[in-house]
Swiss-Prot record:
Natural source organism: Xenopus tropicalis (Western clawed frog)
One Pfam family recorded for the sequence: NUDE_C
Post-translational modification: Phosphorylated in mitosis.
Protein name: Nuclear distribution protein nudE-like 1
Keywords noted in UniProt: Coiled coil, Cytoplasm, Cytoskeleton, Microtubule, Phosphoprotein, Transport
Record's GO cellular component terms: centrosome; cytoplasm; microtubule; spindle
Main location: cytoplasm
PANTHER family registered for this protein in UniProt: NUCLEAR DISTRIBUTION PROTEIN NUDE HOMOLOG 1, NUCLEAR DISTRIBUTION PROTEIN NUDE-LIKE 1
Localisation per UniProt entry: Cytoplasm, Cytoskeleton; Cytoplasm, Cytoskeleton, Microtubule organizing center, Centrosome; Cytoplasm, Cytoskeleton, Spindle
Polar residues compositional bias, start-end: 188-200
Coiled coil: 13-190
Compositional bias of kind Pro residues: 335-346
């Protein structure tokens, strides 16, 4: 309206009318603008109140979110610490399990090697048994020639006495070792329930050898043997002071078996000679009565000699079977070891 051109008036009345109408229009526009301003102010006040309310709510929500954020940060930190702790524990447990697995594999390999050695030892024992059977058969064939060697048997009788001295000493030491082994087994009974039980075969073998020596009749010690066998100081079952190798254990058992077989052979020879002497004395009709009575004593000695010979001919393998040791492949399958035994030193 400011740029509106003022028209040219022909008369003052037209000019008055024009300006009156212009004043009315301006007044009307002013009134409308004022109403709009009032309405706008009311709307702005309402909007401002609403915005204030929304601002308060937003600030409250923001404070809540900040507190939640802080709480969640604390929880995240605690969870991170727990996760790190759990990860450390898991890593440690995995390391322990890997170490146990490595030890178990090592023990498994050692047990496989030990089983192979036992199988080889069983094969050696079987061959020794067959060789012993062959030698016994050969000895039966040459038994008739042994009658002419009575003088030599007297010297072998002295050797028998020295061997019996060694056997008696072995029996005493075996009894002491068995008592010590029983004490140590009772002491270690609590720690013997988690490991495999197959390596107890050495203990069974040693026990069978000791039982074989204990099955002989006790003979009083009359002489001292210069070249007697000196047994080991500890049983090689993992509880002694110095565990022996499998070859040393097998050699010790072979020595004990040879001693037992040698004693049995000597006793059988002595019994055969006494039986022959008794038969020769009974065939002579002019033999005095005193000799007959002494022949009765000789028969008693022969009967005792036969008993000794039977005990001597009970081989190491038979005694092992009686005492609970049954070599695989010779007398059948080996019975399972007790589940509470610890593995022996390999």
């Amino acid at each position: 309206m400011e740029n509106e051109e003022i028209p040219e008036f022909l008369s003052p009345k037209e000019e008055i009318v024009y300006w009156r109408e212009l004043a009315k229009r301006l007044k009307q526009s002013y009134q409308e603008a004022r109403d709009e301003l009032i309405e706008f102010q009311e709307g702005s006040r309402e909007l401002e109140a609403e915005l204030e309310t929304q601002l308060v709510q937003a600030e409250q929500r923001n404070r809540d979110l900040l507190s939640d954020n802080q709480r969640l940060k604390c929880e995240v930190e605690s969870l991170k610490e727990k996760l790190e702790h759990q990860y450390a524990q898991s890593y440690k447990q995995v390391s322990l399990l890997e170490d146990e697995l490595a030890r178990a594999r090592s023990i498994k390999d050692q047990l496989h090697k030990y089983v192979r050695e036992l199988e080889q030892a069983n094969d050696d024992l079987e061959r020794a048994k067959r060789a012993t059977i062959v030698s016994l058969e050969d000895f039966e064939q040459r038994l008739n020639q042994a009658i002419e060697r009575n003088a030599f048997l007297e010297s072998e009788l002295d050797e028998k006495e020295s061997l019996l001295v060694s056997v008696q000493r072995l029996k005493d030491e075996a009894r002491d070792l068995r008592q010590e082994l029983a004490v140590r087994e009772r002491q270690t009974n609590g720690t013997r329930k988690s490991a495999p039980s197959s390596p107890t075969l050495d203990c069974d073998k040693t026990d069978s050898a000791v039982q074989a020596s204990l099955s002989l009749p006790a003979t009083p010690v009359g002489k001292v043997c210069d070249n007697s066998f000196t047994p080991p100081k500890g049983i090689p079952n993992g509880f002694g002071t110095t565990p022996l190798t499998p070859s040393a254990r097998i050699s010790a058992l072979n020595i004990v078996g040879d001693l037992l077989r040698k004693v049995g052979a000597l006793e059988s020879k002595l019994a055969a000679c006494r039986n022959f002497a008794k038969d020769q004395a009974s065939r002579k009709s002019y033999t005095p009565v005193g000799l007959n009575s002494s022949g009765g004593g000789s028969s008693a000695l022969n009967s005792s000699g036969v008993k000794y010979s039977h005990a001597g001919h009970t081989s190491f393998f038979d005694k092992g079977a009686v005492n609970g040791y049954d070599p695989p492949g010779v007398l059948g399958s080996r019975p399972p070891s007790p589940p509470g035994m610890l593995p022996l030193s390999v």
